[in-house]
Curated annotation (Swiss-Prot):
This is S-methyl-5'-thioadenosine phosphorylase. Pfam families: PNP_UDP_1 (PF01048). Its main location: cytoplasm. GO terms for biological process: L-methionine salvage from methylthioadenosine; purine ribonucleoside salvage. It is found in: Cytoplasm; Nucleus. NCBIfam families: MTAP (TIGR01694). GO terms for cellular component: cytosol; nucleus.
Length: 298
């Protein structure tokens, strides 16, 4: 069996959604069964590896976490032929050990979101058929995550190779009571966009990993000033340069690996398998006209 050709989707947060990190850039307007992605795709190359970039919040950071079209973003990357999704995200720290300015490569999630469609299989006319009970015991791809951590180590960037990511609805920050509750649940960092993004990537059979940039201590500490947007942005700007360094160094390492077995295993966990837009259109018309006339669509 031929090796799987690696193509990497990048979902960038503020500062890491700059298309200048790519060569041979082209803007591509796409639509999906779930609507349009946050922004047009940017296709191109990083270190000779084909990549596709999406600005998660829009290039002007105008889309709040709840309103991001996560399904369209992930679906668009799947249809572009991506095998991996590597994302960047800001996060707060829920432990003294993870300090502002450091990088975390999370391996687990506690989902506290409440308002977001979290599956492609929602029973609507534009969705794949059936119900997908995707395994989520290890939501992040451990192999991709380790490559990112290895490159951070080589670059001498302070980082943590694992972390439990608590994902809140936002856009507000936590109360002190909530922050302490999240610590009690085992959370180590807190962010707003990993869910349903990682679940959808798993439904799409893609390897998903994150570069989480610690911008602040969340408000669980009595002796620390409350979180403010200004303090978060100031630290985040310092983190961005390190995140880009890791991304650029890791992408050729990801591409050099034979992912055939891992990708096939991920695809085998998706039951029923995810379908492309052509098949979704077929299903939509099939439902309209009924099985007796389905041959007309062949």
């Amino acid at each position: 069996m031929a090796n799987v050709k690696v193509k990497i989707g990048i979902i960038g947060g503020t500062g890491v959604d700059n298309p200048n990190i790519m060569t041979d850039r082209q803007e591509k307007f796409v639509d999906t069964p779930f609507g349009k992605p946050s922004e047009p795709l940017i296709t191109g190359n990083i270190q000779g590896v084909e990549c596709v970039l999406i600005a998660r919040h829009g290039r002007k950071h105008t889309v709040m976490p709840t309103d991001i079209n996560y399904r369209a973003n992930v679906w668009a990357l799947k249809e572009e032929g991506c095998t991996h999704i590597v994302v960047t995200t800001a996060c707060g720290s829920l432990t003294e050990a993870y300090r502002p300015g450091e990088i975390v490569f999370p391996d687990q999630i506690i989902d506290r979101t409440t308002k977001r469609p979290s599956t492609f299989y929602d029973g609507q006319t534009n969705s794949p058929v059936g119900v997908c009970h995707i395994p989520m015991h290890d939501p992040y791809c451990s192999v991709t995550k380790q490559i990112l951590a290895n490159e951070a180590q080589k670059l001498g960037i302070p980082h943590h190779a694992s972390g439990v990511n608590v994902v809140i609805e936002g856009p507000r920050f936590s109360t002190r009571a909530e922050s302490r509750m999240f610590r009690g649940l085992g959370g180590e960092i807190i962010s707003m966009t990993a869910m349903p993004e990682v679940a959808l990537a798993n439904e799409a059979g893609l390897c998903y990993a994150a570069i989480a940039m610690v911008t602040d201590y969340d408000c669980w500490r009595d002796d620390h000033a409350p979180v403010t947007v200004e303090s978060v942005i100031a630290t985040f700007k310092v983190n961005v340069a390190n995140a880009i360094k890791i991304l650029i160094a890791a992408i050729p390492e990801i591409a050099a690996k034979d992912w055939t077995e891992i990708i096939n295993e991920r695809k085998s966990q998706v039951k029923p398998p995810i379908l492309d837009s052509t098949w979704v259109m077929f299903i939509r018309e099939y439902r309209k006209i009924g099985s007796d006339d389905a041959s007309k669509l062949m």
